């Protein structure tokens, strides 16, 4: 097992699991997430959906995001990213190569976050929708040319340069806001 895998295993062993209810009948989703003081720790998987050198993103307010979300208990990261694409886009998908493992620390709305993120290249097995649905929230989807990523407020911002320059090798990235 490589260093990143060992780190993730150690992280998951000490991680407390919170149960989050997402309003889907009686189904309980257990996400890897815990809060210590004012810091929320979590493990996420995101989809880098590319076609013709364009990235599929969703827009919320003035920011753009890739599709993805929390990994659930006993779920492989590549299963999580496929599940998230299905839940949010309503399209079947297939996980491709893992491109980035990111340790992302940032603050949002007065809360500190420390996420371990797995960013996979993902192939859609159907047409991309015009909107994304997360719980009760609908957001528009857009294809953004990789050469234009620098012109938008993409979250996480490292993708603006790392994705167009990606050489096919797994990269481990540390981000701190």
Q: Where do the language-model regions lie?
A:
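Active-site-adjacent beta-strand/loop module that shapes the phosphate/pyrophosphate-binding cleft
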Residues: 106-130
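Acidic/histidine-enriched, glycine/proline-rich intrinsically disordered or flexible terminal extensions
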Residues: 165-177
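Acidic, metal-coordinating catalytic segment for phosphate/diphosphate chemistry
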Residues: 18-21, 25-46
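Conserved Nudix-box catalytic region and its N-terminal flanking loop in Nudix hydrolases
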Residues: 50-87
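A short coil-to-beta-strand element that immediately follows conserved catalytic motifs
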Residues: 92-101
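Short hydrophobic targeting helices and cationic amphipathic motifs
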Residues: 12-15
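NUDIX/MutT-family hydrolases
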Residues: 121, 132-165
